[in-house]
Amino acid sequence: MATLNTRGNDIALNILSSTTESSQAVVLSRARGSPNSQRAWLFGLGTLGIILASVLLNPFTSTQESPLNIDPTDYAARTKHILSTTPLIDGHNDLPYLIRTELKHQIYNDRFTFNTGLLSNTDRKKLRDGMVGGQFWSAYIHCPKDSETNKDVPLDEATWTLRDTLEQIDITKRFVDEFPDLFQFCSNSSCAREAFANGKIGSFIGIEGAHQIGNSLASLRQLYDLGARYITTTHNCDNVFGTAASTVSAGGEDKGLTLFGEEYVAEMNRLGMMLDLSHVSHETMRDTLRLSEAPVIFSHTGAYALSKTLRFAPDDVLKATAEKGGIIMITFINRFLRPDDPDAATIHDVVDHIWHVAQVAGWDHVGVGSDFDGTPVTPRGLEDVSKYPRLVELLMERGATDDQIRKFAGDNILRVWSEVEKAAERIQVEGRKPNEAIWEGRTWVRSEMSPPIMFRDSIGRRIPSYLGEP
């Protein structure tokens, strides 16, 4: 439940200050004399009490208008007000990956000076200066490569990716727990709103690549139970579920989703886990949008119409995502925003992509997914997480309204997340069981080839030597 805090108090004062002089007279001046005037006074006082109670108990219901005393051209003041009353939620940040690779999981190491400052894009001060209200922390593991050829390993070859994914989740949870005054771990959309109301940064987990789940829907379910709430269907490699954009960029065929990928989409819908289409090929995007029973997300992508980067979404996909109720969250990666001249990328390129998506898909379907700490270089003007307010100000300069900014900042992704949860509830109420499909290319080792013991029609095939010596 939302707590009473300065956000709610500020909004209440705004309501009081914005009432007309005549209405204040009714509410604040107890009329004397006739019963009618006394009833009017009581009615006015009761009405104001209801308004104030609703504001203080749920600050998210009171953010539809800016205070009347803010100059519409004072973009900094408008931004501060909006981000104080609506959570700014980034769809993708790789700080846990840096902790794993640079500190070998050791968040208690003295070198991890998160409180006093890091050279990376993210630390305590930068998050607070950037008015961040929620963050999807990425559990990212590289696509497995052959150590000699640097080529993708065969899909049925056992790798370390699932183990490392579990370690990455462990890092994220311990990191969040280490700073309880700053972060609150959440696994549902309601908690994300509660965290913001409590003055904390809601912290959520997304897995950046279904190659990390061991080709197994059973593993998928366990990762959900550990708190992961989205999975990027592919990273920079094909997997058993679908084609990656990187494959098409290298001249490979765009085969879209596999048959097993269709089972994966269905199970993600049943679980209430968001399907992330960043990194996937265009046909994988289209196949998923056709099959999914819930909205989808692009946690960190861009508009293909502005930059011919094959991992960006073309306009037909932007429109289909909107029709499905989903969201496209814009990334800050230079080489994708400006493939012709990455060093020239600036904050204005990001604004261009946001604006294009808003015009094609609508303001209900656009958000931000930076990929901070997952890319070595970011656009000028977006050097770290402290720069989000400036991004919002530039959108306002282009003409974005306060309501549109609130949607972009966090309301859209929270709506999508909530709708994915509701779709899962509906599917489960219908009685759909966990999907037991198994990838056709799975290799069964000898120890997994069970002897015929359970069933009468097969017991005659029992081979005593196979069972081993007593």
UniProtKB/Swiss-Prot annotation:
Its main location: membrane. It is an enzyme of class 3 (hydrolase). One of its GO terms (molecular function) is metallodipeptidase activity. GO terms for biological process: proteolysis. It is found in: Membrane. Signal peptide: none annotated. The chain crosses the membrane at residues 40-60. CDD domains: rDP_like (cd01301). Substrate binds at residues 235, 311, 371. SUPFAM superfamilies: Metallo-dependent hydrolases (SSF51556). Glycans are attached at residue 188. It is a single-pass membrane protein. It catalyses: an L-aminoacyl-L-amino acid + H2O = 2 an L-alpha-amino acid. Keywords: Dipeptidase, Disulfide bond, Glycoprotein, Hydrolase, Membrane, Metal-binding, Metalloprotease, Protease, Transmembrane, Transmembrane helix, Zinc. Gene3D superfamilies: Metal-dependent hydrolases. Coiled coil: none annotated. Zn(2+) 2 binds at residues 208, 279, 300. It comes from the Eukaryota. Hydrolyzes a wide range of dipeptides. This is Putative dipeptidase TSTA_079200. It comes from Talaromyces stipitatus (strain ATCC 10500 / CBS 375.48 / QM 6759 / NRRL 1006) (Penicillium stipitatum).
